[in-house]
Structure formats: C-alpha cells, structure tokens
Amino acid sequence: MMSALSQAAKSLLLQDFVSAFFLSMRQFFAPKETINYPHEKGPVSPRFRGEHALRRYPNGEERCIACKLCEAICPAQAITIEAGPRRNDGTRRTVRYDIDMVKCIYCGFCQEACPVDAIVEGPNFEFATETREELYYDKDKLLANGDRWERELARNISLDAPYR
C-alpha cells in the first residue's frame, strides 16, 4: 500500500519530469565542448601521426642515409627508395624517395625505424586533394614538407625523446 501511495505522489508531482528538466537546464548553460573547426583548431598531440616529411640537418643537407629500413618495415609497402652511389666519405643519399599516401596506414613504423630521424610524420592533417596523383609524394614534396614544418617537428621529437 505504501509503495502505491508513494508511486502516486511521485507521478502527481511530476518528479521525474522536473529532475529531467533541471538536468537539461544545467547542461544547456554549461560550457560547450565542441569547437568551430575551420576557424578554431584543437590541440594536437606531439605524437600525432599526420603528413610525412623528410628532414634536413641544420647545414641544409638531407638526413636520409638510404639505409632503407623504413622501406623494409612498412607493412603497406608504400615507400620506395633508390640509393645513389657512395660518396667520398662513404655515406649514401637517396636519389628517389617516394611514398604512396593512398597505401600508407599511418602506423609510424617508418619514423620509429629511422636511425637519423629523417622521415617523420608531422602535425599536418589537412592535406586533402582532388586527385589520387597528388597523394603520391616524391622526394621534393617530402623535403618541402620538412622545411615547412621543421620547427614543430623538432619540438615534437624532443618532447617524445624521453619515451623512446
């Protein structure tokens, strides 16, 4: 009898409706969690894996030593490297360094395998194109990406260094 009486009082006073209404009002006036994307950008983690880039040393020489570890470890087989002849000092550089971004799965294995931090995945995630051919990155495009993002790439690598 008591439970029926309390149930009737609860429905008569619209307790569920009122509590739901106050919950809605609290959420309505709370700060918004979304951002207006094209005009505002959220924070990007230093470990974010975006558009690929080839880095240079401070003297302007490219870092890649044509060891081909990134090509060997790539599970999608998206990287193609051609090594040039050995130089007088015994080192090699690449003649051709291509990445097919359509095949790439952005796993980051190439970046982890590189002994000289030459190939990195940068902070850029806005690289949509109209044709598939534009997603075939050659060495010049990768070096241009590295030059454009070098300051942020160096900062991200230094922030990630304690965890490597």
Curated annotation (Swiss-Prot):
InterPro entries: 4Fe4S_Fe-S-bd (IPR017896), 4Fe4S_Fe_S_CS (IPR017900), NADH_quinone_OxRdtase_chainI (IPR010226). It is found in: Cell inner membrane. Keywords: 4Fe-4S, Cell inner membrane, Cell membrane, Iron, Iron-sulfur, Membrane, Metal-binding, NAD, Quinone, Repeat, Translocase, Ubiquinone. One of its GO terms (cellular component) is plasma membrane. One of its GO terms (molecular function) is quinone binding. It is a peripheral membrane protein. The keyword DNA repair does not apply. Its cofactor is [4Fe-4S] cluster. Its main location: membrane. The keyword Metal-binding applies. SUPFAM superfamilies: 4Fe-4S ferredoxins. [4Fe-4S] cluster 2 binds at residues 74, 104, 107, 110. GO terms for biological process: aerobic respiration. PANTHER family: NADH DEHYDROGENASE [UBIQUINONE] IRON-SULFUR PROTEIN 8, MITOCHONDRIAL, NADH DEHYDROGENASE UBIQUINONE IRON-SULFUR PROTEIN 8, MITOCHONDRIAL. NDH-1 shuttles electrons from NADH, via FMN and iron-sulfur (Fe-S) centers, to quinones in the respiratory chain. The immediate electron acceptor for the enzyme in this species is believed to be ubiquinone. Couples the redox reaction to proton translocation (for every two electrons transferred, four hydrogen ions are translocated across the cytoplasmic membrane), and thus conserves the redox energy in a proton gradient. NDH-1 is composed of 14 different subunits. Subunits NuoA, H, J, K, L, M, N constitute the membrane sector of the complex. This is NADH-quinone oxidoreductase subunit I.
